[in-house]
């Protein structure tokens, strides 16, 4: 607790210094530090397809990430979060067709294993995105379940001993809402897809599905992964925080048995009090959406020149989160792949961008930096693709540049 309170005090002390340093433009030489080997890290978020192309095909890949490990380490980052790398029919890859493989556009399982090994040699932890709330509509679990349901006679009930995959999703013999879609080839069955018709929701309360994801964890831990970023964790079961916490806890506990240093950070895109409730899962980190985003505490403090408001927010986070999990590790950020980049939010003001970055790095926990933030990359338009544009490596040299 003393450490966390100290981080809040540091914000007050450094706010003026960071701002003055940004305005004056005078740099200082920093000594290298020996960082403790724990789960307090500085993470760098990477959309692999837009990061660095190692083979000239226009697509970023795992080999490209490996080539840039020194760059990432020199930034002061000792953790990497890879956005989805599993096979998927979409560019963003949040709809998975195989949870135990690497999308061929990004490389191979051996490439991932080599990347993990190279990360560990440099003291970098490597975590990957796991979209467990839903699969792709092209996943064999879903296609086999749909084929089975389409073959049932009128009034016949599904039998999971005949087709176990009918229990893997939320199927119904009636359309229960606007997020339910007709099973292909059937006029009698529907399935839930909260985000999109091509992202059918998985039934994560099913012991069989939970077992599947334990096997998924085994696969990636064997390849060298150090942790998971859990996508859409608050949507596993809608409006069911306790059930979702239980789902997270079970998988995290299983992973910790395999690797005692295993790390998990979850996406709970909600207010501070809801995020606090998810710390009851016993998992270490939740992304702090109250601090991040265009209307978050960090940006507000920079816009208004008001460090006291940020300190008050930090103290509230520490109080509320620690009550649910005394060992929590906050996960603050400025922006990510689902929102406008921080440079856009701060209207490309270099002083404010640097101040925001400086404040982020003073916060307690493990801060997350979105690739390109360190050079003030921005984006135009509101489409998600615009938020995941190719990393800019040089104004003149196109080596490694992706096509996006």
Regions found by a protein language model. Name each.
Residues 34, 38-39, 258, 312, ...:
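Loop/helix patches that line or flank the sugar-binding groove of alpha-linked glycan CAZymes
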Residues 268-360:
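Noncatalytic carbohydrate-binding groove/subsite architecture in carbohydrate-active enzymes
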Residues 154, 194-195, 241-257, 261-263, ...:
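Extended substrate-binding grooves/exosites of carbohydrate-active enzymes
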Residues 22-203, 208-211, 222, 229, ...:
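Acidic/aromatic-lined carbohydrate-recognition and catalytic surfaces
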Residues 218-221, 336-338:
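Catalytic grooves of carbohydrate-active enzymes
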Residues 4-24:
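Sec-dependent N-terminal signal peptides of Gram-positive bacterial secreted proteins and lipoproteins
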Residues 45, 81, 227-230, 265-267, ...:
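Short beta-strand segments
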């Amino acid at each position: 607790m003393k450490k966390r309170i100290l981080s809040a005090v540091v914000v007050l002390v450094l706010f003026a210094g960071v701002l003055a340093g940004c305005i004056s433009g005078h740099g200082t030489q920093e000594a290298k530090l020996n960082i403790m080997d724990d789960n307090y890290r500085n993470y760098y978020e990477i959309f692999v397809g837009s990061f660095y192309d190692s083979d000239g095909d226009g697509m970023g890949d795992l080999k490209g990430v490996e080539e840039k490990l020194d760059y990432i380490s020199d930034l002061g980052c000792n953790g990497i979060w890879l956005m989805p790398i599993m096979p998927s029919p979409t560019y963003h890859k949040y709809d998975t067709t195989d949870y135990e493989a690497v999308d061929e556009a990004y490389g191979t399982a051996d490439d991932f294993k080599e990347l993990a090994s190279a990360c560990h040699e440099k003291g970098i932890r490597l975590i990957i995105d796991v979209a467990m709330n839903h699969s792709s509509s092209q996943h064999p679990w879903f296609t086999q379940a749909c084929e089975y349901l389409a073959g049932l006679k009128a009034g016949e009930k599904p039998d999971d001993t005949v087709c176990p995959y009918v229990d893997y999703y939320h199927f119904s013999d009636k359309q229960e809402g606007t997020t339910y879609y007709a099973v292909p080839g059937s006029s009698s069955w529907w399935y839930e897809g909260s985000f999109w018709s091509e992202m059918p929701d998985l039934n994560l309360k099913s012991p069989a599905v939970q077992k599947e994801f334990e096997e998924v964890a085994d696969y990636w831990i064997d390849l060298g992964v150090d942790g998971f970023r859990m996508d859409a964790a608050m949507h596993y079961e809608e409006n069911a925080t306790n059930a979702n916490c239980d789902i997270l806890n079970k998988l995290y506990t299983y992973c910790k048995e395999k690797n005692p240093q295993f790390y998990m950070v979850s996406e709970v895109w909600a207010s501070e009090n809801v995020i606090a409730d998810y710390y009851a899962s016993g998992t270490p980190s939740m992304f702090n959406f109250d601090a991040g985003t265009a209307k978050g505490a960090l940006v507000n403090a920079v816009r208004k020149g008001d460090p006291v408001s940020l300190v008050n927010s930090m103290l509230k986070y520490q109080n509320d989160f620690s009550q649910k999990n005394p060992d929590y590790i906050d996960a603050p950020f400025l922006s990510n792949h689902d929102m406008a980049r921080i440079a856009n939010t701060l209207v490309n003001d270099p002083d404010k961008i640097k101040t925001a970055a400086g404040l982020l790095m003073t916060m307690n926990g493990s801060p997350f930096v979105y690739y390109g933030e360190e050079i003030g990359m921005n984006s135009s338009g509101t489409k998600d693709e615009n938020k995941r544009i190719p990393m800019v490596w040089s104004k003149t040299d196109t080596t490694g540049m992706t096509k996006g």
